[in-house]
Amino acid sequence: MSSQNTTQWQQTLESAQNTALLQDGRRKVHYTFSDGSEMSEEYDAKSCELLSRRLRKKGTLGDAKAWIVEVGESNVPILAQKEIGLMESSSNPVVSRIDKSDYFSWRIRNLPYPIDTYALSIEDRHIVIRTTNKKYFKKLEVTDLERLELELDPAELTYAHANNTLIVSYRKPQAVIEFERKLMTKLKKLKSDGDVDQCKQQ
């Protein structure tokens, strides 16, 4: 995708209704799309790094479905997880995406195997994780690249392991960095209630 092209996702963002709030050092932005679905994002007010992204679709009967966490830690209370049958063993691998300004990054906790156990590859527009002992398999979807119609490049994929956590990183293409910079410029122009805007110029 060239920087001059406009993707369907960019058009969707442009046409969405949005509100912004500066609170507790975070810039909170809420989008409502034409199909009734929603997206909620939170950014660090100083660094402008994305801290959280959640999405929610509208049900066929018009009711709102549960929020799906795309970036950040899930904040579903443990009691609620038990009630809706989502509670898993505390020893099961847990995936969370924690991005940086120049990387997409995933942390997969409760993976005790040494680093030479893991094999990562790019398959069908996903990052695929396998272990040589065949005890773990996972596909990671890079939604930001899909929305901007960009391909994954195996050369930009790295990983490390420490404290029973596998850390998978993918360097953001320049097209993504430019998109995020332009988006933040627009978000800073939204009328926000709350704290004084401290976001650094990108």
Predicted regions and their residues:
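N-terminal low-complexity tails
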Residues: 1-106, 171-202
